[in-house]
A protein has these predicted regions:
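Typically the conserved alpha-helix immediately C-terminal to a functionally engaged Cys/Sec
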Residues: 48-50, 71-86
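Bacterial N-terminal signal peptides
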Residues: 5-15
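Thioredoxin-like thiol-disulfide oxidoreductase module
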Residues: 80, 91-132, 141, 148-152
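Soluble non-cytosolic domains of exported or imported proteins
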Residues: 44, 69-73, 119, 138-142
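Short active-site neighborhood of thiol/selenol oxidoreductases, capturing the structured segment around
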Residues: 53-68
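N-terminal "domain-start" segment that seeds a small globular fold
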Residues: 20-49
Length: 182
């Protein structure tokens, strides 16, 4: 009985003395960044491979990231926003660079061929596998939307979307209201 009381005391103290925190601005590992910071766990693991995407003539977005990188955490809502806008029209292939360490780099149908060794890195490839956008760090979602529209041959309309935080961890893409600034 005495042992049970001591055990309960230790368990209660462990939970109160060492709370768990997640922080978008730190380089700590908090778990997978898409469900935690973008509210979209369906992006990982990728639903397709680059090879399949090119074979099916689909536009691909490659996103190379690490779960314990603050810049990658900050971009997760933007990648999730692109998924929301273009879900049925493009393939989003988000890969942690840990997965790429022992892969060969010679094949242009493989994801690692396009990774430049820095994170986060975002690329847009047309249906033929030609790189139309390649950037490390912060991305311009409007520029990516314009590129995707051009590849698809549809008119590009200036974006009326923005990515806004709805709590301290998650963000959502929402319609931009420019009337507030007038």
């Amino acid at each position: 009985m005495k042992l049970l009381i001591i055990f309960c005391y230790l368990v209660i103290n462990l939970y109160t003395l060492f709370p768990v925190y997640a922080s978008r601005s730190s380089d700590s590992y908090d778990g997978n960044i898409f469900p935690i910071y973008a509210g979209n766990g369906s992006i990982v693991p990728p639903q397709t491979t680059l090879r399949d995407s090119i074979n099916n003539k689909r536009i691909s977005i490659l996103f190379f990231y690490l779960d314990d990188n603050s810049d990658s955490k900050a971009l997760a809502p933007a990648i999730s926003g692109l998924d929301l806008i273009w879900r049925n029209s493009i393939d989003i292939i988000a890969l942690t660079t840990d997965e790429l360490q022992n892969r060969k780099q010679e094949d242009p149908n493989e994801e690692k061929f396009y990774w430049n060794g820095l994170i986060p890195q975002t690329l847009v490839l047309d249906g033929e596998g030609n790189v139309k956008y390649d950037k490390n760090g912060t991305i311009d979602i409007d520029q990516i939307n314009k590129i995707i529209s051009e590849i698809k041959g549809i008119d590009y309309e200036e974006s009326s979307f923005s990515i806004e935080s709805f709590n301290e961890y998650n963000s959502i893409i929402s319609k931009r209201d420019d009337t507030k600034n007038k």
